[in-house]
Amino acid sequence: MFALSLLLLPLGYIVYLIGLAVYRIWFHPLSKFPGPKAAAVSEYWEAWWNIWPHKGGCLFEVERLHGVHGAAVRMGPNEIHVNDPRYYHELYRLGSRYYKDPEMHKVLGAPSSTVAETDPVLHKIRRGALEQLFSRQSILKLEPMIMGKVERWSSKLEEHFQAGKPVPMEFALKSLTMDMVTTFAFGQEFGAVEDPGFMSIPVRLFRNYLMSLHVIKAFPFVKLLQGLPYFIARHISPTVEMGRHLEDLSDGHINSFVDKWQNGDKPNFPTVIGRLLTPNEDKGFQVPSKQGIKDEVITLVSAGNDTTGITSMVGLFQILTNPKIYDRLLAELKTILPKVDSVAPYQELEKLPYLTACIKESLRYASAAASRTPRLVPPGGIYLPDGRFVPAGTRIGMAIYLIHFNPDLFPNPRVFDPERWLRDPAEMTVQNKFLVPFSKGTRACIGINLAHMELYTIMAYLIRRHDLKLYNTTAKDMEWWDMVIPEFKGTFKAWTGKRTE
């Protein structure tokens, strides 16, 4: 009898799974939405496309499915993906009733950060404490610091050229943005630019961490590695070892900043930690714990480093492979930077129409945060623009990549074309509305002003000061997998000799 019971248990579980699959495919409220049956049955359909055997391919499979099935496809037991521009500004807008999905944001770690906060009231308090810091007026005060980083970085590029070494541009650009954003965050840089090959641990770690999120989402238990003794975990995962190094580095920077702050030694430019250490009772903001400060700062560094580095890298590659674009941009830069070592105010760079067009097109073409950012359908459900009803609690999202490469919004979207941003303003109304690299609404990227300053400064001085030439790099190398951020299939290298005039 006991043996029979043991046999019936697994059989019963199998029957349950079969019944669950039948319900999800044919009787679930989302069963009217087309999509793969495997996606309707299990969220591991996404893992199949993102981890193995396809690696970072779910975004592109969803793109294909939209081509077959139309504006809305089912990509999980309780999730649909929408590719209808009419819906974008409803889903992602100020005052939106759509909440972030707590389960999705557990993947990120840093639970006390603003990015991971799903409660709209708490999110408003936390974001409100930082909004003034990230305002345009505040970011303009960072200009001397940003320019100092560019000067140092430029000298390192020249050193590589003199040593006969082509520069790995992805890591070089991410090293620069790393030192910019960590100085803004911690009051002092991580020193990524000083690494001889631009392969410092922080740069590699943030890149590897973001690329590991597909695995963490599918198999949350892997986060238990962080709780293992260090001497064991380091042999299982190199990322754990780098993570411990980052923890120590961050703790050291935070402790150093707090000690100086308490002794009245404050930086002469705005910093994230400085703002977090300043309570605001009127807005309900209290100074976070040390862990809360670290969560906030590390999340901001992670979000701001790779995306800006990737955008500038993709834009630079496209410019270098299009001589007409390159020559026109260089000629425009020379109008306000007449000498190789000339310096112009950031607000003057912003006024350059062709530079602005190149940066806008880089933001569109790179789509560095390409994937969907899902939300939960609010109580009462919603109707899509085509009239279909989506019940409350459904996870729903739209990918920025599919917006930016929609031919109805951006004609010839696979062509890098700065000219599209130089037409009559009336013609560009739709394009400007749907250029959404920072998302939109209450949850839009808070660092947009900092990112713009970095992009203008990097692009202007890199192209004006250095005679850039590709080294063993083709368009094939710039193809990518969607690993939360793009992971490129090859390496973009360039010669970075200093111009003589």
Curated annotation (Swiss-Prot):
- Per UniProt, where does heme bind? C445
Query: How is it placed in the membrane, per its record?
Result: Single-pass membrane protein
Q: What induces it?
A: Expression is down-regulated by the cluster-specific transcription factor AOL_s00215g275. Expression is also down-regulated by the HOG1-MAPK pathway downstream transcription factor MSN2.
Sugar attachment sites are N305, N472
* Effect of a null allele: Abolishes the production of arthrobotrisins A to D and arthrosporol A, and accumulates three new epoxycyclohexenol/sesquiterpenol hybrids with different oxygenated patterns around the epoxycyclohexone moiety. Leads to a dramatic decrease in the conidial formation but develops numerous traps and kills 85% nematodes. Develops far more adhesive trapping devices and traps and increases the number of captured nematodes by the traps. Shows significantly increased ammonia levels in fungal mycelia.
- Required co-factor? heme
State which residue ranges cross the membrane: 2-22
Q: Which GO terms describe its biological process?
A: terpenoid biosynthetic process
- Stated role: Cytochrome P450 monooxygenase; part of the gene cluster that mediates the biosynthesis of sesquiterpenyl epoxy-cyclohexenoids (SECs) such as anthrobotrisins and arthrosporols, metabolites that possess a novel hybrid carbon skeleton consisting of a polyketide-derived epoxycyclohexenol combined with a terpenoid-derived monocyclic sesquiterpenol substructure (PKS-PTS hybrid). The SEC pathway plays an important role for fungal soil colonization via decreasing fungal nematode-capturing ability.
Protein name per its UniProtKB record: Cytochrome P450 monooxygenase AOL_s00215g280
| Species name | Arthrobotrys oligospora (strain ATCC 24927 / CBS 115.81 / DSM 1491) (Nematode-trapping fungus)
